[in-house]
Swiss-Prot record:
The keyword Membrane applies. A lipid is attached at C23 (N-palmitoyl cysteine). GO terms for cellular component: cell outer membrane. The keyword Protein transport applies. Residues 1-22 form the signal peptide. Plays a critical role in the incorporation of lipoproteins in the outer membrane after they are released by the LolA protein. It is found in: Cell outer membrane. This is Outer-membrane lipoprotein LolB. A lipid is attached at C23 (S-diacylglycerol cysteine). It comes from the Bacteria. It is a lipid-anchor.
């Protein structure tokens, strides 16, 4: 049975401390910051912002921290008080999800998140969209006047994802989205990127 994460967010019950505990101490602090002319040049980055998810069975908004290094992703959701509600660590072939003090493991992070929480979120493509890039099978449907992507369609089983890049900003020397809306039948995800920092990887 999926975990009621909206209930968890409201009551903040039995949430364990985790590796990703919010903005006061982040994984990105272990790396030197880097300026890039294009976001795709960054092999590692960290993001701080907010995420709001609305589905037929759930609705919530919370803080988001995301650390990306190559094919590895580590993200956490925290309340306004800094309490960690959910953490998800993934690398090829292995994903670990912590919520309500329990750990769940699967080979695919997207399948794991949906099985535990009931959320259908396109995690595989999010690192690309967050940095303003396009997936292999994505089709750009509109551009802003300045030439930056305004919207795209991403093929998916049952219903395609409609991705809207509502606004853009300059971070770490590159143009990256400020606000993104991702939606398909019955599901809407909004991400606000307050800080995106490119990081220098260790040689």
């Amino acid at each position: 049975m999926p975990v009621n994460l909206n209930h968890t967010l409201l009551l903040c019950l039995l949430v364990a401390a985790s590796l990703l505990s919010g903005c006061s101490s982040t994984l990105g602090e272990q790396y030197q910051t880097l300026n890039v002319s294009q976001s795709k040049q960054a092999k590692a980055w960290e993001l701080q912002g907010k995420i709001a998810v609305k589905s037929p069975t759930d609705k919530f908004s919370t803080n988001l921290y995301w650390f990306h290094l190559g094919e590895e992703n580590q993200l956490s959701l925290t309340t306004m008080l800094g309490t960690t509600v959910l953490t998800l660590n993934s690398k090829p072939g292995l994903a670990r999800l912590e919520v309500d003090g329990k750990e769940y493991v699967d080979s695919n992070p997207q399948d794991l998140l949906e099985a535990v929480s009931g959320w259908s979120i396109p995690l595989d493509n999010l690192p690309l969209w967050i940095t303003g890039q396009v997936g292999v099978n994505d089709e750009i449907s509109a551009y802003h006047d300045d030439g930056l992507i305004k919207s795209l369609i991403s093929p998916a089983p049952e219903h395609n994802w409609q991705v809207s890049f509502l606004s853009w900003q300059q971070q770490s020397g590159a143009s990256v989205p400020k606000q993104i809306k991702i939606e398909r039948a019955g599901v809407q995800v909004r991400i606000q990127i307050n800080r995106w920092q490119a990081l220098k990887t260790q040689q």
